[in-house]
């Protein structure tokens, strides 16, 4: 039986859709259908000419079809049919009271905008559908594509002005989505610096929930991802609709439950302080808004998104074909906690010796190597090697690192400048500012206006020179403040708000050009931790820095939240010193290692002070990690026990795609009343296959079989040794199919 998504269209028995192709159009009913990955998405043109959503959910049958869309009726005289009808891309006009997709002001002051279907073209994996205002020559081309494996849709819009006068776009969503009336739980991610990735779950009440960043970048406080589950939250069961916006500037997602209990979701550029002037013939391209559906709970949704990101979002470097997943990340050492700004040739070489002894793959020198960079008060913008610290340049250090069989990475912060720098003294007009107004500093730095062509050329130029002159494999690209005074006085006053779009476009353009010129160089997106993580930056960045907070217990909850939206492949997780600088919490090296081994592993501790036992422990666990890393970062992730809500325990499991290997991590936060770790029933294994159990760290209960069927491990489960108790304890096991 079809779900109520199709309540405004009658079901027909005659099929006009050929399901061998991902996209089909019924010209008689004016209905579009997209199929992929056990998902169907259907929309059509109603008799008024509006583009109306009809269905989004599990895949429909090959003989199922829809009649022409029927608009929703009005509700008394206060809510017209126009506002009640779930439009694919509604203009703000004709009495629309829900969130519009597009809002504009014309040269004569008119602000009414009603978009009707004009035409469409089929593409390889979807449609381009053209809408036009009922009178004015403003066009919105909606781009639809569906992934045949996951059923995840990619939607965006191109706004074009064919009027004889300029039009100001005041709001432009990438897409609008709709769900029928029902009881739902909204899931989204919130946080702050050093406290990112908090999974927030709440009933979807009447009204609007706005999730946004006004900061000029993605932000720590919210992330452009959502998941809406029918009914109560459930990891393994129930329908989930989810989405992620690919934009690294100011953004907004609005989730509304309207007066008739229907749900609308819009997302795109943040309309706060937004105004993009389109001159005749000009276009505005929105970001891409990805949306997906799972019938298998939040776990099923996140696994779909993980594999979609690996297959279609992350960069393809040399040696990795489009059909192959990106390679697992190198295990890195980063110098920051060991030396902070006090870097020099001899000290970094000594750290490189220690890192190589651990089995590290990549040595990364952090802040302090350039200009007059003794602390965070000076030097940003002057990207030349400090001759006092590195009298022979970077080459001797890089050669040393290569001789130790590691590659070399370097920290940069290209979009920032210190007022105490040669660059700022020469070009004070290059920063975001309003002339004559104070310039607000954060961390003693200002933001370069990357929207300016001269700033874009400078940033690309110095990075290209740095990478051309040095054998650098990796850049840790940082961004340590948000915007203030977002002026751009090169443009007329009415057009200066274009800075919100052009800054981010130029960031992407620089990254794309660097990839073209230096295709082997990999990038990490860092912004004081997780302040710039989204599917836009991940088109160019191979990994991200989730948080400056590396406390291993805090990271369990952060990594849990992160995993709902992003693959563990990109989640860098460092082992740092104990007690931790933020919480003063003391934990064992084993606990810290296992916490970080759930993602892409890094060492950020001051290893110059490690004793032989610590070196041996880290070396052993790094070697064990290398053996199972592809399963951990590219497999199916199952969150077996959540670390949230005061849980004493937590556990995760990953299973590789052919179900030949699985890795399990178990953590005790704080044992209470002598309770033992609960029996852990595993998931995702082949029930008919036999799996051997091998300890990476810790012991199973005496009598646990050395090998058993997948059915045993999933139905009976794994019991831990009676002595697995205490505070901040960790264990890990691998299972290998015989």
Q: What is each model feature region?
A:
Residues 22-34, 41, 51-256, 272-274, ...:
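Polysaccharide-binding surfaces and accessory modules of carbohydrate-active proteins
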Residues 38, 226, 643-687:
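Carbohydrate-binding surface patches
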Residues 391-393, 425-427, 431-590, 600, ...:
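Active-site neighborhood of glycoside hydrolase catalytic domains
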């Amino acid at each position: 039986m079809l779900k109520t998504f199709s309540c405004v269209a009658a079901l027909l028995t005659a099929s006009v859709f050929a399901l061998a192709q991902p996209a089909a159009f019924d010209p008689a009913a004016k209905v579009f259908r997209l199929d992929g990955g056990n998902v169907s998405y259907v929309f059509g043109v109603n008799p008024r000419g509006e583009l109306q959503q009809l269905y989004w959910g599990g895949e429909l049958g090959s003989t199922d079809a829809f009649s022409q869309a029927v608009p929703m009726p009005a509700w008394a005289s206060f809510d017209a049919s126009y506002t009640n009808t779930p439009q694919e891309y509604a203009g703000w006009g004709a009495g629309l009271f829900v969130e519009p997709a597009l809002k504009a002001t014309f040269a004569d002051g008119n602000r009414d905008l009603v978009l009707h279907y004009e035409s469409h073209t089929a593409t390889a994996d979807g449609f381009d559908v053209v809408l036009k205002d009922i009178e004015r020559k403003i066009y919105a081309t909606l781009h639809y594509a569906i992934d045949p494996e996951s059923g995840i849709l990619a939607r965006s819009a191109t706004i074009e002005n064919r009027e004889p006068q300029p039009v100001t776009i005041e709001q432009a969503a990438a897409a609008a989505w709709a769900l029928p009336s029902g009881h739902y739980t909204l899931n989204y991610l919130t946080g702050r610096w050093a406290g990112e990735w908090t999974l927030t779950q709440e009933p979807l009440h009447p009204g609007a929930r706005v999730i946004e960043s006004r900061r000029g970048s993605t932000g720590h406080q919210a992330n452009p991802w959502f998941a809406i589950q029918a009914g109560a939250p459930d990891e393994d069961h129930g329908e989930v609709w989810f989405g992620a916006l690919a934009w690294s500037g100011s953004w907004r997602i609005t989730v509304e439950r309207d007066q008739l209990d229907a749900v609308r979701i819009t997302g795109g550029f943040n309309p706060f302080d937004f105004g993009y002037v389109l001159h005749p013939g000009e276009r505005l391209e929105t970001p891409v808004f990805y949306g997906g559906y799972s019938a298998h709970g939040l776990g099923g949704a996140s696994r779909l998104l993980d594999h979609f990101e690996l297959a279609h979002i992350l960069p393809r470097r040399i040696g990795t074909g489009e059909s192959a997943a990106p390679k697992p990340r190198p295990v890195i050492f980063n110098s920051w906690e060991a030396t902070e700004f006090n870097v020099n040739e001899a000290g970094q070489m000594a750290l490189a010796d220690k890192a190589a002894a651990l089995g590290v793959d990549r040595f990364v020198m952090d802040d302090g190597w350039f200009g007059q960079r003794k602390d965070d008060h000076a030097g940003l913008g002057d990207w030349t090697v400090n001759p006092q610290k590195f009298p022979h340049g970077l080459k001797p250090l890089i050669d040393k690192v290569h001789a130790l069989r590691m590659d070399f990475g370097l920290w940069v912060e290209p979009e920032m400048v210190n007022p105490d720098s040669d660059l700022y003294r020469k070009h004070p007009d290059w920063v975001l500012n309003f002339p004559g107004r104070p310039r607000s500093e954060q961390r003693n730095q200002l933001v370069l206006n990357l929207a300016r062509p001269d700033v874009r050329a400078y940033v690309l130029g110095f990075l290209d020179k740095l990478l051309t002159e040095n054998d650098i494999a990796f850049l840790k690209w940082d961004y340590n403040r948000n915007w203030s005074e977002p002026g751009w006085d090169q443009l007329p006053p009415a057009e200066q708000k274009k800075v919100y779009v052009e800054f981010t476009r130029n960031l992407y353009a620089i990254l794309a050009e660097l990839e073209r010129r230096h295709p082997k160089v990999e990038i990490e997106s860092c912004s004081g931790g997780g302040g710039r993580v989204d599917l836009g930056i991940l088109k160019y960045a191979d990994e991200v820095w989730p948080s400056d907070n590396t406390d291993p217990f805090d990271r369990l909850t952060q990594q849990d939240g992160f995993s709902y939206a992003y693959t563990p492949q990109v989640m860098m997780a460092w082992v740092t010193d104990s007690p931790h600088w933020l919480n003063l919490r003391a934990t064992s090296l084993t606990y810290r290692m296992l916490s970080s081994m759930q993602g892409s592993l890094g060492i950020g501790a001051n290893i110059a002070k490690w004793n032989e036992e610590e070196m041996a422990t880290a070396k052993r666990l790094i070697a064990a990690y290398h053996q199972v890393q592809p399963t951990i970062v590219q497999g199916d992730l199952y969150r077996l026990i959540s670390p949230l809500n005061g849980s004493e325990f937590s556990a995760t499991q990953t299973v590789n795609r052919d179900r030949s290997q699985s890795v399990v991590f178990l953590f005790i936060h704080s044992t209470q009343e002598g309770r033992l770790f609960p029996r852990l029933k595993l998931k995702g294994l082949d029930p008919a296959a036999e799996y051997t159990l091998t300890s990476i760290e810790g012991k199973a209960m005496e009598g646990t079989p050395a090998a058993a069927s997948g059915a045993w491990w999933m139905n009976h489960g794994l019991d831990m040794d009676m002595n697995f108790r205490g505070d901040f304890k960790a264990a890990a096991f691998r299972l290998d199919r015989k």
